[in-house]
Amino acid sequence: MIRIALDLMGGDRAPEEIKAGALMYLQNVKKTGRKVQLVLVGLADTLKEFEHFKSEGLVELVEAQEALPMDVKPTDALRRKNSSMYIASQLVKEKKAEAIVSAGNTGALLSCATLVVGRLPGVDRPALAVPVPSLNDFTILIDAGANAEVKHEWLIQFAAMGIEYAKILGKRNPKVGLLNVGTEENKGTELEKQAYQLLKQAFNESFYGNVEGNDINIGTVDVVVTNGFSGNIAMKTMEGVAKLISHTIKQEAKKSLDGILGALLFSRTLKKLKKKLDPRTYGGSFFLGVDGIVVKAHGNSDRIAIYNAIDVAVRGVEGKLVEQLNERLKVYNK
């Protein structure tokens, strides 16, 4: 039985959309018979409607005393041990759950992941890894928002985790690139210049060199490493462009008979495109480098995104992501 701790109180749309996503997932579990139990952590009044699932063994209800606001400081998150996020993290630490899913504040979840759940050996800072759609299937963007400021040695660890994550997802001999304002070796701040040399030494032929923002979706490399500040801006920009494309196609299809006929003719293709570009499809992203599965859902997640975030966590447990990553990182820690 896989046990997933879900923070019902985290996110811009909490608790209603988080609860709705949990209900959707529970219905799927009942239908498919998957061996998954949700450990729902929230304020007392948010847990009531899940009581009837207890007799079926589909849920465990854990009461929290408070919800962390979305603007909470990471250090405050660690002090508020009665919050839903902290309690859910503690459940993973104590092996009472295999994973935590939260749409709460990223910095707060990073603090809980790092200092409550704990880090893998040799990892200084966990990082948010996002598989981004590309012309070459996908590109791993790491860090996508966890660490706004980084040290150049952290970027080496991010690259190592990104490479091994890409291998787990099926990439053979993945190439890593450093996000920069140009491809020349001398581009960027001192941080990027130092990181470039260290990446070159550490990964040899696996290091492609500097890459630019457009290379992420082109798929020039399999892993793009950067600080969380630049990574988050890049990710949010791509989300905005995806919405623009979807909206433009929809609007143009309505303007003429040719557009309507074209939309009907290519409806299946357009649906696939929309699904691929929709951030909700991917649900959530892993904090890599943590000694447990920690999935960060988008702060603005709706029920569909939460459903998919839970599924991401389940697949992470089933695929033994933490165990594989821990084993693969040993080569870098010698």
Curated annotation (Swiss-Prot):
Domain of life the protein comes from: Bacteria
Protein name: Phosphate acyltransferase
Chief location of this protein within or outside the cell: cytoplasm
Function as written in the Swiss-Prot or TrEMBL entry: Catalyzes the reversible formation of acyl-phosphate (acyl-PO(4)) from acyl-[acyl-carrier-protein] (acyl-ACP). This enzyme utilizes acyl-ACP as fatty acyl donor, but not acyl-CoA.
Organism: Fervidobacterium nodosum (strain ATCC 35602 / DSM 5306 / Rt17-B1)
Enzyme class: transferase
Subcellular location: Cytoplasm
Organismal lineage: Bacteria, Thermotogati, Thermotogota, Thermotogae, Thermotogales
GO molecular-function term, one example from the UniProt record: phosphate:acyl-[acyl carrier protein] acyltransferase activity
Pathway: Lipid metabolism; phospholipid metabolism
